[in-house]
Regions:
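N-terminal secretory signal peptides
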Residues: 1-7, 11, 15-27
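N-terminal lobe/hinge region of extracytoplasmic solute-binding protein
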Residues: 61-114, 255-256
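Mature extracytoplasmic/periplasmic domains
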Residues: 236-238, 390-419
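Extracytoplasmic/periplasmic ligand-capture domains
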Residues: 7-8, 28, 98, 124-158, ...
């Protein structure tokens, strides 16, 4: 560790939970922000706030050693641990900004017809494939996306990985997939031209235009098009390695087109990223000179590495958070920061037909949960603030989610997030940092009494156990 490493190192601690390399690298490497988006993209970029210190040129982060990547072919993986690495090495049609909205990547602009059933993507003309050493190996055109799409929806080639989005949304993609299933081993000989002849709703009018025809109007297709199902693949590389070879290509064999390359990789130990010298976005985006990911056995080790200045950030265990937050003079009290929310929602799902251990129906619970007033007591009276604090001790109520999905999953054509539309329809208030939205200005005493009266009348006894 040299002096420059020490001086330029910003210090911050993350609250709790696991953070993926994809979000960290992409945010600074260009995969999550871009210019050149069209009106239909609704894109907006947010520059990083300065803390007054020298910017980091090298970034040292971590990952759990049980989340090591297992695939180098992004088309043949559905594992987030793989995507955390691979989406920094390979770009697709679109990416997303820090708010989850699609922004330009290899497609520099896009639009759709009036009913959003046909989407046209206009590709950059300066995107190249390169090998692991940064040597240019080919030029990317619309053909590479045809090859990639055919690979994904060909059951023999990609073994059904990443098929759900194209099969659900693209015209005749499901029929073509079923066709490859029927062909069996013979599907290995199919090419993208066979896919086009079959009538699958994807075409390339020229080298830098790609058109998708959806089964039905699909106003959110730009959010779909950024997924790995629609990433490009090189026909030359597939022919060079063969189907099995490409499917299970190694780090040294694969070709790349993203903002970073892997400089060094030691399985379940470390991996380091360096800028891809051939990346099309090099002049428009800032990138770290190096990113090193250390694989950790546990958070205790990670905290020690942070204290030794060997990591720039680390997630904390609940006990460590408590220790720091309970001591305003703690050396790390001013280094705590909140984690960016992930696009997952956690929910209560009631069992309306519960059985006892002996196999008999749990009538007491089943009657209670069938009562609307009983369920509303849960909805309007359950304050989970202390539970949220186990994840976010700084602002626990930032964890509250009163919707079926999380923010950033989808939005309307005006750029308004789906959860905001639901919030308005339900009459929910906004986050205030003090009280849960569901329990705000609500006195459930009358509701509780109503539930108890109604349940007592049908023989329910209290307390109700589940």
């Amino acid at each position: 560790m040299n002096a420059n490493f020490e001086i330029s190192r910003r210090s911050f601690l993350k609250g709790a939970g696991a953070v993926g390399a994809a979000g960290l690298l992409a945010a600074c490497g260009g995969s999550s922000s871009s210019t050149g988006s069209t009106a239909t993209s609704g894109a907006a970029s947010a520059p990083a706030a300065s803390n007054g210190g020298a910017p980091l040129t090298e970034y040292y982060t971590w990952e759990s050693n049980v989340r090591e990547l297992e695939e180098w072919n992004v088309l043949h993986s559905q594992d987030a641990a793989d995507f955390n690495v691979l989406t920094n090495l390979v770009d697709g049609l679109l990416s997303s900004d820090p708010y989850g909205k699609p922004v330009a990547a290899i497609a520099e602009s896009w639009e759709h017809n009036e009913d959003a059933s046909v989407w046209t993507f206009h590709l950059r003309d300066d995107v190249d494939w390169c090998d692991v050493n940064g040597n240019v190996t080919g030029h990317i055109t619309s053909k590479d996306f045809l090859v990639g799409c055919e690979w994904v929806i060909n059951q023999y080639k990609n073994e059904a990985f990443n098929t759900s989005m194209p099969l659900q949304n693209v015209l005749n993609a499901e029929e073509y997939y079923n066709h490859t299933v029927e062909l069996g081993d013979a599907a290995a000989d199919l090419t993208y031209q066979d896919m086009l002849d079959f009538g699958v709703g994807i075409e390339a009018p020229d080298d830098y235009t790609l058109v998708f025809t959806c089964k039905n109007p699909c106003p959110y297709f730009d959010t779909v098009a950024g997924y790995v199902s629609f990433y490009p693949a090189s026909e030359d590389l597939i022919n060079q390695l063969g189907i099995d070879g490409f499917r299970y290509a190694t780090q040294l064999e694969m070709w790349y087109c993203g903002p970073y390359l892997i400089e060094e990789y030691v399985n379940r130990n470390t991996k380091s990223f360096i800028p891809n010298p051939t990346w099309y976005g090099a002049d428009d985006h800032s990138r770290f000179e190096r990113v090193v990911v250390t694989m950790l056995t546990d958070q205790v080790v990670g905290y020690q590495l942070y204290q030794n200045r060997e990591l720039d950030e680390i997630d904390l265990t609940e006990s460590t958070i408590t220790t720091i937050t309970n001591d305003p003079n703690h050396e790390y009290a001013d280094q705590l920061c909140e984690k960016r929310p992930k696009k997952f929602s956690y929910q209560f799902h009631f069992n309306f037909e519960r059985f006892n251990d002996d196999g008999t129906p749990d009538d007491n619970w089943n009657k209670a949960v069938a009562n609307e007033a009983f369920r509303r007591c849960m909805l309007e009276g359950l304050d989970l603030t202390t539970y949220y604090a186990r994840t976010n001790a700084i602002n626990p109520l930032k964890c509250e989610n009163d919707f079926y999905t999380m923010q950033g999953v989808c939005y309307n054509t005006s750029g308004k997030d789906y959860t905001e539309l639901v919030r308005e329809r339900m009459g929910y208030g906004q986050y205030d940092g003090e009280t849960p939205i569901r329990t705000r200005n609500t006195d459930i005493a009358a509701l509780k009494q109503q539930a108890m009266d109604e349940l007592s009348a049908i023989g329910v006894t209290f307390p109700v156990h589940c």
